[in-house]
C-alpha cells in the first residue's frame, strides 16, 4: 500500500511539473500527452465532485492474461512504458481530482472471474463494483437480470452517447432498448481484440502488386480485388503446396476457421438481425447467401489459400499459419490487432502493414470489422452494487474521458503506428478499422438449445467439405439456434 501511495503522489507531482514546463516552454510541442490536473475538463461531467477517497473495485482478467490486461485497469507503478504509464497517470488524476481510487481485482491465472462475481453476489459480500471482461462470458449475466441497464441508472454520471464510448457497441448490443455493456477509451484491449488483415509489404514489392493502401482509399478493397492479389503470390517447391513453414512455399493468404465469421461480418453480414422489435436469424437471407458464395470463391482457392484447420491438428496448424506469415511466405493473414505484441511478429524480419476487412463487393458502402468475442472486454455493473453505484458510474465516465485524452494517442502512435507498423499509412488504416466496428448477438450469445454447437460456429461446419451450401447447413441447425434465441427473447423481451 505504501508503494502504491508513494507512486500516486509521485505521479501527481509529475503532472503538476508538466503544467509548469508547458507554460515555461511557451507551448512547444511534446510527444508525450500533457495532463492538466486543474483544467482540460471541458466536455466531462458538468458536476465536478470529490468522492473523498472512495474505492471502486473492478473485477477483470488475471494480470498475465493479455498485454495491458493489468495496466488498463490498475497499473502498479510507472515503468517507462508509454501505455502503462498513461493509464497510471489517468488513474492518479482521477484519484487526485475526484477522490476515486480505481482498484483492480485480478483473479489468479485460470480462475473463473464470472464464477467469482456470481459467488460475490450470492454471498452478499458485494466486493466487486464493476466487471471488465470478455463480452461472451459477461453477456449471459444480462439475461439473468444480474446487470444494470445503463439507460435506467439515472444518476446522470454516465453518458453512453459520448464519443469516448463505442457507439456501435451500444447500438448493436442493445437488448429491448437496454444497454448492459459498454466499452471504449477507458481501455485498449477492445482495440487489441479487433480483427484486421495483415499484409506483407515485401511480397507486394516482389510481385509488383497494386498498393493495398490505395485500393482501400479508393473504396475498391473487396473479395474480388483481394482474390486477384492472392492469386499472384504462388511459390511451390514440390508437387503440392506445403503448410510446413520450413519448406518455404508461398501462399496468397493463410487463414483459420474463426476468420470465416469475421470475413462475413466485415462484409456486413451478421448472423442475427437486431434492428427489429426482436432479434432474428438472417443466415438464409438472400444477401447473406450471395456474399458467402462470393467469399468462398476466394477462400476455397486451395492452390493459393491455406486453411489451417484442413492441414492437420488445428492447434499445431494455427502455429504454422503464424510462422508462414512471419517467415515472409504469405501475402495476407487475418488476425486480431493484438498479435503485433506477440514475440513472433516482433522478431519477424519482414515489413508488414494493416488493412481493414474487405468489403463484399461494390454494393457495400463502408468498411467494417468485428472482434473476437472471447477476448473483447466490456464494462458491466452488477445489480449487487447499490451503495457505490454513483461513484462507480462517475469513475467509469472519468476513465473513458481521460483515457481518450491521455491513453488513446499513446496506444495508437507509440505502441501501434510507430513501434509496431512504422508507417503513417497504418495509422490511417487503424482509424478506419476502429471507427466502424460491428457486433452480432449471434456470436456474443452463441445461441443454441444447450445440447450442441451454437450459432457462433455455424461457418466452421462448412469448412470440412469446402461447402457453399449455406441453406441446407442452416436448415439442419435452425431448430437448435432458434431454441436458444427464443429463450433469450423470453428472458429479455417479456412484457
Whereabouts are the PLM-identified features?
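Short, solvent-exposed loop/beta-turn-alpha elements that line the ligand-binding surface or hinge
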Residues: 152-164, 216, 244, 269-290, ...
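Short helices/loops that flank or line small-molecule/ion binding pockets
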Residues: 114-127, 138-144, 227-232, 316-331, ...
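Conserved N-terminal structural module of periplasmic/extracytoplasmic solute-binding proteins
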Residues: 2-11, 16-144, 406, 464-495
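Conserved C-terminal helix/tail region of periplasmic/extracytoplasmic solute-binding proteins
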Residues: 383-393, 403-495
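Extracytoplasmic/periplasmic substrate-recognition and gating elements
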Residues: 345-416
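Extracytoplasmic/periplasmic solute-binding protein
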Residues: 59-62, 125-131, 135, 175-197, ...
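Glycine-centered hinge/linker elements that transmit conformational signals in sensory
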Residues: 227-230, 270-315
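Hinge/lid segment of periplasmic solute-binding proteins
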Residues: 38-54, 61, 108-111, 136-195
